[in-house]
Amino acid sequence: MAIHIENLKIEQFRGIRQLSVPHLNHINLIVGDNNCGKTSFLEALLLLRDPGDFTNTLRIARMRDSLAMYGGISAYESLLTLFPHNSNEAETARMLSLQARCRGEDVLYSLEGNVKTIMLDAEEQNRIPRYSIRNFRKFKDSIPSECQAFQGNLLVRTGNNQEKTEIRFHEYSTVSGRDITNRHLLNIVYLAPFDHLRGGNFSRILTNDPYKELCVQILQLFDPGITDLLMLKNENTNRPIECVKHKELGIMPLSSYGDGIKKVLSIASGIARAVDGVLLIDEVETAIHSRYFEDIFRFIASACRKFGVQVFITSHSIEAIDGFLSIVDYEKTTGQEDPISVVTLKKDWSSSLSYARVLSGCHVHQNREQFGFEVRL
């Protein structure tokens, strides 16, 4: 079983405060009430992908705004949304912090600083995209000489190594053109609830014939006539088209199929990209009918074990939770290592603190069968 992240403590990240999960597993089902922090939990894990790269932090901050074609907030505003509001701190103070144990090493991530008003020199003024939609009305005929900015330090400690980087990011800064270090601590892949609508899921699947055959078998749950996955070029545009070969209909573009097939292919591609790393699946049940849960989840568990992938999965659906628990025959595996943990998140709104209850899959399965245990609360 792949367990690359052994434990996690989120000191502060978005709406999560003082959340401790002392033991993580190969398959981690993250559940809880609305607004308890399930998606934020996955985003915090993404900080461990490349903790010393501030661009990685900005990329995480921008993820929720990625589908907004118009009217999205600025990169600076996105960054500020990562910091939880704390009435006990000075109004300008900001801090993100988490600790984890990854592959036997202790890891610390801490971004701490203040929001303040700064002067913009002539060089920085000239770099402001004054004709962008967001800034056009604001600037009109004048260029701002001052603005709001976050100034602080990013501290990262991995084992005995420590790195401290000075950070300065103001309200007219952009993400475009920033350096990407690619010093990945962990290979972490995140799948948003609607990533399957973006396309681009074939490339990793097609390079591995045995894995492609396994994916085709899963797709046959939806349509028994599917026999192959192909990538063809459009004769007019020369652009690649993701296609499905059908024994009766011939070659069909993937776009002609429903969201369920696209969702399964998105997950399959995510597993292939997360080899020897971590896969984060947000709202796994999206676009999948409950009658397919057990077969698809069995595929996820099998493929993740094969490729050495630790997986974290959020869900609102009790049927999805039961579907995952059903892939293990707990009546016959008594005493064996349980690959599944169910992590229930809960937020105390009076203290703003977050809590986690971690139960084994076997414990939840038995209590679901005997008492109808509601694990999501």
Model segments located where?
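Switch/communication elements of ASCE P-loop NTPase nucleotide-binding domains
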Residues: 1-55, 251-376
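Phosphate-coordinating catalytic segments in nucleotide- and nucleic-acid-processing enzymes
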Residues: 51-272, 278, 341-377
